[in-house]
Amino acid sequence: MARIGDGGDLLKCSFCGKSQKQVKKLIAGPGVYICDECIDLCNEIIEEELADADDVKLDELPKPAEIREFLEGYVIGQDTAKRTLAVAVYNHYKRIQAGEKARDSRSEPVELAKSNILMLGPTGCGKTYLAQTLAKMLNVPFAIADATALTEAGYVGEDVENILLKLIQAADYDVKRAETGIIYIDEVDKIARKSENPSITRDVSGEGVQQALLKILEGTQASVPPQGGRKHPHQEFIQIDTTNVLFIVAGAFAGLERIVSDRVGKRGLGFGAEVKSKAEIDTQDHFAEVMPEDLIKFGLIPEFIGRLPVVASVTNLDKESLVQILSQPKNALVKQYTRLFEMDGVELEFAEDALEAIADQAIHRGTGARGLRAIMEEVLLPVMYDIPSRDDVAKVVVTKETVLDNVLPTIVPRKPSRTERRDKSA
């Protein structure tokens, strides 16, 4: 054991050599001693290493082409939206890395601004699923919020800070990890103000919510009630910085196409102008031509639009795309139901015309890809009820007639085994 000869029998730290008189605390172990200063130093080293391990590594960050390729495995169609999202997400996390390097070296000459994303398009076309798949690939916390439940602070409804609580919960209350997560705000078109002109009366669930969202979209130090609900003075808050949180704001924006049509149609005035019929204007991809003034006319305030510089539009899915969605992605519905039937020892098969009929039904109902599962459930319900109680079924074949005329699927009986035939003959 280390001693200091001229100071009596003083113990000293086995790591830095300081005596017990030179430090505040000396902790003894089996044959060794460590002082409080060395403990603090070790703690700092460990925290720095853990922080480095938690950060999104730039060299590990997938390139835009790799992000798009990953999305292709789960989402059919929407190629323009995939490219837009891939570039926006890559640039967002590259910006976070640049900020971290600037803090370390203090030499970053340009401060990179955040680019949140606005997604436009009809319901059931993959907006939510695209965002969920992105978060899954990047392994970052992901939260979904419904804009229709939000109200301005002080009114009945949810405060905008509750959106951040969902993200913190998705990160298991790891605030540092939540600060690099993704928040998807759906139904944002429902918080458009009622008219293009500013209202004299209070619009607490429309323009008021847009105003309340401005700060967290841009980046702020927000105080979040740990149990949700309304804030009150006697509770503790979780502090979260939203500067590096990526917001994807989405909505169906029904009626926006008419605003775009009116603006695009006005181009056909004057000599030599290309004149288009209303039918031709209506069939083009309106959302791809959306301009900020169209969104302002729809009811979003300019400050809100300004914080959503990246616009990604999704289009209605045609019959061919819906058929591909049923069978091709990694989590395709056909694969899911096939697996369910396999668990009962039965093979499930869909005729090609049956898949086309299911796609036609979804288009007719106007539910897009979201309605495919409901149709599949209706078609397969009778056999899913009977099959578990039977042991004589080898295969179930779903045909076009099954979908359109409520005819039961074709049942292929199972051939009895040699033992069963022997027992039967005996």
Curated annotation (Swiss-Prot):
Annotated binding of ATP, by residue: P122, T123, G124, C125, G126, K127, T128, Y129
SMART domains referenced in this protein's UniProt entry, alphabetically: AAA (SM00382), ClpB_D2-small (SM01086), zf-C4_ClpX (SM00994)
Residue ranges occupied by any ClpX-type ZB domain in the UniProt entry: 1-54
Annotated binding of Zn(2+), by residue: C13, C16, C35, C38
Example of a GO MF term: zinc ion binding
Pfam families documented for this protein: AAA_2 (PF07724), ClpB_D2-small (PF10431), zf-C4_ClpX (PF06689)
One of the GO BP terms on file: cell division
Domain of life: Bacteria
Keyword line: ATP-binding, Chaperone, Metal-binding, Nucleotide-binding, Zinc
One GO CC term, this protein: HslUV protease complex
Entry-linked InterPro entries: AAA+_ATPase (IPR003593), ATP-dep_Clp_protease_ClpX (IPR050052), ATPase_AAA_core (IPR003959), Clp_ATPase_C (IPR019489), Clp_protease_ATP-bd_su_ClpX (IPR004487), ClpX_bact (IPR046425), P-loop_NTPase (IPR027417), Znf_CppX_C4 (IPR010603)
Record flagged with keyword Metal-binding: yes
Function: ATP-dependent specificity component of the Clp protease. It directs the protease to specific substrates. Can perform chaperone functions in the absence of ClpP.
Family, as annotated: Belongs to the ClpX chaperone family.
Binding partners and assembly: Component of the ClpX-ClpP complex. Forms a hexameric ring that, in the presence of ATP, binds to fourteen ClpP subunits assembled into a disk-like structure with a central cavity, resembling the structure of eukaryotic proteasomes.
NCBIfam families: clpX (TIGR00382), PRK05342.1 (NF003745)
Name recorded for this polypeptide: ATP-dependent Clp protease ATP-binding subunit ClpX
Originating organism: Mycolicibacterium vanbaalenii (strain DSM 7251 / JCM 13017 / BCRC 16820 / KCTC 9966 / NRRL B-24157 / PYR-1) (Mycobacterium vanbaalenii)
